[in-house]
């Protein structure tokens, strides 16, 4: 007895869907999935959390959720803002925090500072925990402190955060957006790297510490990429042509990273993906400013006030979440300008106030692989995006 045509069609569609699901899950499971920027350490210190507890609904990340999302390599950000007193001391506090997490969870995670250790962690099915300093102010204008952070396991440093250092200017400053005490900072500083900044880049090359050009101003970018003898890392940035946020890379910069042999890892922050979000966010902040002021006056901390307001107005937060597909528009632009060998993932989870749609926390990384499969990327190219490009740059920066 022959089946009716529509029944055969339905069965074939069902098998296609099952096959596609099995395909992306297999690719994701077999890949060494790397993310080069996560701020969970500073978030845990600020909020009194610990990484190995269940933080669902409180943060984007925790240990078990990273493992559930198939993450194999996570670079943890060692971060404080430019107002932090004794930033080098705070950096060491954050490093100590990660050390303690690893010590408590030896069967689930491993501290990694070399390609050989990364391979070992992956073979043992442990999260490879790496560290990157976010902001050159944390070395306090002292190369010996840079050396010390390297010796403690730090393997990249962004030359600036949003604030300038005495030796490098930031994207926020160079674009005229830098704020100080609630007002535009009019402090005059020559753009780019000064002589000490050049020494920092050269010292990082010598140590085997990746030079990270996220957050830096245009002139600092060009000074650093022209000085560096090693491939550059851009750990968490997107494309200016698609979303003109001052933190994003212009097309000539993207091309230059490709020529340098470096990698640009995509940031998930909606305001860097979607050009409409910045205006929405400003309206949201202004609308709730009095409410936030009252909460802080009542004794709430800044982050607690933000969390309370966000919890009261979930629809407004949802309206600021960039469409998932925009991440892949940025990815494709980098591929077109620099090549498939020069793009990866640096989500900035727990360093961003809200996420894009779909990518609500670290368990959603498989959705990236699923979409790459749907868009027709080959298994080889997906592996490059998820793992190979960052690992190649990491290896290329090692001292022979």
Language model features: what each stretch is:
Residues 1-24:
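Bacterial Sec-dependent N-terminal signal peptides
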Residues 189-237:
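Loop-centered beta-sheet repeat module
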């Amino acid at each position: 007895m022959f089946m009716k045509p529509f029944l055969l069609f339905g069965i074939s569609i069902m098998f296609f869907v099952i096959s596609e699901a099995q395909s992306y899950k297999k690719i994701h499971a077999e890949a060494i999935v790397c993310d080069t920027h996560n701020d969970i350490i500073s978030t845990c210190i600020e909020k009194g959390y610990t990484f190995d507890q269940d933080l669902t609904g409180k943060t984007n990340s925790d240990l078990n959720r990273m493992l559930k999302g198939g993450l194999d390599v996570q670079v943890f950000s060692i971060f404080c803002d430019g107002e932090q007193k004794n930033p080098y001391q705070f950096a060491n506090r954050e490093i100590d925090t990660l050390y303690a997490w690893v010590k408590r969870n030896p069967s689930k995670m491993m501290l990694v500072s070399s390609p050989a250790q990364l391979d070992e962690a992956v073979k043992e099915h442990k999260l490879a925990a790496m560290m990157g300093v976010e902001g050159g102010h944390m070395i306090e204008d002292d190369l010996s402190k840079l050396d010390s952070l390297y010796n403690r396991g730090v393997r990249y440093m962004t030359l600036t955060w949003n604030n300038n250092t005495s030796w490098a200017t930031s994207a926020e400053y160079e674009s005229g957006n830098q704020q100080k005490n609630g007002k535009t900072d009019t402090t005059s500083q020559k753009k780019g790297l000064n002589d000490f900044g050049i020494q920092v880049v050269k010292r990082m090359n010598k140590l085997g510490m990746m030079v990270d050009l996220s957050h830096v101003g245009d002139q600092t970018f060009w000074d650093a990429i022209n000085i560096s003898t090693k491939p550059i890392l851009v750990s968490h940035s997107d494309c200016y042509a698609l979303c003109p946020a001052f933190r994003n890379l212009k097309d000539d910069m993207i091309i230059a990273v490709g020529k340098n042999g470096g990698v640009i890892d995509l940031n998930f922050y909606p305001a860097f993906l979607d050009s409409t979000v910045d205006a929405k966010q400003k309206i949201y902040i202004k609308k709730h400013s009095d409410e936030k002021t009252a909460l802080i006056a009542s004794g709430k901390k800044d982050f607690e006030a933000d969390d309370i307001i966000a919890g009261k107005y979930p629809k407004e937060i949802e309206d600021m979440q960039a469409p998932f597909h925009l991440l892949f528009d940025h990815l494709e632009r980098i591929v077109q300008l620099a090549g498939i060998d020069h793009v990866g993932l640096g989500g900035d989870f727990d360093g961003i106030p809200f996420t894009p749609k779909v990518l609500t926390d670290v368990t959603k990384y498989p959705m990236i692989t699923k979409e790459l499969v749907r868009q027709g990327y080959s298994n080889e190219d997906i592996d490059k995006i998820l793992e190979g490009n960052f690992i190649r740059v990491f290896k290329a920066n090692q001292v022979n």
